[in-house]
Amino acid sequence: MEFPGGNDNYLTITGPSHPFLSGAETFHTPSLGDEEFEIPPISLDSDPSLAVSDVVGHFDDLADPSSSQDGSFSAQYGVQTLDMPVGMTHGLMEQGGGLLSGGLTMDLDHSIGTQYSANPPVTIDVPMTDMTSGLMGHSQLTTIDQSELSSQLGLSLGGGTILPPAQSPEDRLSTTPSPTSSLHEDGVEDFRRQLPSQKTVVVEAGKKQKAPKKRKKKDPNEPQKPVSAYALFFRDTQAAIKGQNPNATFGEVSKIVASMWDSLGEEQKQVYKRKTEAAKKEYLKALAAYKDNQECQATVETVELDPAPPSQTPSPPPMATVDPASPAPASIEPPALSPSIVVNSTLSSYVANQASSGAGGQPNITKLIITKQMLPSSITMSQGGMVTVIPATVVTSRGLQLGQTSTATIQPSQQAQIVTRSVLQAAAAAAAAASMQLPPPRLQPPPLQQMPQPPTQQQVTILQQPPPLQAMQQPPPQKVRINLQQQPPPLQIKSVPLPTLKMQTTLVPPTVESSPERPMNNSPEAHTVEATSPETICEMITDVVPEVESPSQMDVELVSGSPVALSPQPRCVRSGCENPPIVSKDWDNEYCSNECVVKHCRDVFLAWVASRNSNTVVFVK
């Protein structure tokens, strides 16, 4: 047979010793086991020197001149049989690059010799593994589907997905075109283009993919590990070496430093080692403090709620802090459906438990899991109270919106003790609200805050009168709903008792207590009035705290040292002054002038004198 290329090179195969080239028998090759061959793609340049004829010409010496032709092969194909041992065919396949997998096929899509000029190109399939597909029959190409290919190779092609055909690096095995063009030739081209990409994907699928390790983000507050003595020496000498050799690379500098370190004396090395030991001790101390701080921090968990109730106010990211007061063994988690009380760390430690539907429409509810060291003592003294924290920015920035959409839903069976705390100062400043600093308590409760009142519950209302402001209290059965109304012009509230007045100040909420036997303005019972801080907007339900100590009647008028302005712009604390306060450290940014400071101090002093005097009522103009 003649190969294209101009030289008459013939390769003959004769004799019965090669039954695998017989058309009547099945093609068997030695099994290579389960080994996988990873043969990289070999792209051929368009060079005539790499033609098949030149490659096959090297095998001319291996031909058997005395052998006779195989009758069965000649009868079917009308050509001399080819003597291509399997090893040679494999080598030819690797050089030709037609098929790159050890267990696939090799095609020679040229017209081989003049005897084949009238026939379609002969394709010889030489399987290299245990594939049982025989030779092609009567000029037809033997095709291998994906399932058969995967079963023979012992690999999976990704669940039967058909891979897209990829363009092979070479379009043809040789630059000499075939004189015949047919559908078989197109099929050979498509099949050969698919094989390199399929084999590559198969090999990759066989390997185990390692899951990428996720690196934890470093905390900037975490102390840094100390460096070694050599690293300290490297830092000291690197700048000097760079100054002498500006063009030196990092590797060259490292070599110079290493040689200098080796030649360094033991005493000089000990200096750097002592520095390292000291740095290690400092690092261990800082690391222990850092870990303790991490353990003490509250773990905040966000629980998604069912979006059943509509929300009128969008919920900003939750923020809440609880100040550490004294260690107490407890853990606080909010009830699933009681979402609103503001817990803050600016005033004394209060414990609170209030249910409100105002924040129920928000998509998030914040759970605080607080360690023993962070719990204030007043929390453990509560009667099983649970604290739900809502974002502080909702209270400050939304103003009365939260209060108007909220109603108290505490059941009578619940033992509810409601104590309020001031809102975070940072959130109040961000919301441009007036952050009023409370003066130290001088036997008067903190200022009162405005809240809307539902008409269904009994209330204690503070009515405003021209000079004094007296508290008119109605007799509720057991619990008192306090609704505090404040008029736009801030007024001074004074305490005016009739015979005697018993004022009690406690460390937790400041209260004004009275006797249950002597009513306050026709009130048959006495109640504990807990006043909110100026920045807190919430409704309170307080338990009745009777006290049988004072035998005489009395009228109680609450004294407010700093009335709260509802406008977002802060005003002077003095009663009746509408001017904005001036920034001053001495006044705590609460007064507009020295005159207002003097007048306000006089008013507070006169109110205190009035509370001491049991027989006279002092009115301050």
UniProtKB/Swiss-Prot annotation:
Q: How is its activity regulated?
A: In liver, recruited to target gene promoters following treatment with dexamethasone and cAMP. Binding is decreased in presence of insulin.
Write one Gene Ontology MF term.
chromatin DNA binding
Q: Which UniProt keywords apply?
A: Chromosome, DNA-binding, Methylation, Nucleus, Phosphoprotein, Transcription, Transcription regulation
Q: Which residues carry this modification: Phosphoserine?
A: 178, 181-182, 315, 533, 550, 552, 560, 562, 567
Pfam (any one)? HMG_box
Q: Which residues bind DNA?
A: 223-291
Q: Does the keyword Nucleus apply?
A: yes
Gene3D superfamilies membership: High mobility group box domain
Q: Which Gene Ontology BP annotations are present?
A: positive regulation of transcription elongation by RNA polymerase II; RNA polymerase II promoter clearance
Feature: compositional bias, Pro residues: 307-319
Modified residue Asymmetric dimethylarginine is at which positions? Answer: 481
State its location(s).
Nucleus; Chromosome
Is the keyword Protease assigned to this protein?
A: no
Q: Name one GO cellular component term.
A: PTW/PP1 phosphatase complex
Q: Which residues carry this modification: Phosphothreonine?
A: 176, 313
| Sections of the chain in a coiled coil | none
State the function annotated in the UniProt record: Transcription factor that modulates cell fate reprogramming from the somatic state to the pluripotent and neuronal fate. In liver, controls the expression of hormone-regulated gluconeogenic genes such as G6PC1 and PCK1. This regulation is independent of the insulin receptor activation. Also acts as a regulatory component of protein phosphatase 1 (PP1) complexes. Component of the PNUTS-PP1 protein phosphatase complex, a PP1 complex that regulates RNA polymerase II transcription pause-release.
> Protein name, please?
TOX high mobility group box family member 4
Say which species the protein is native to: Pongo abelii (Sumatran orangutan)
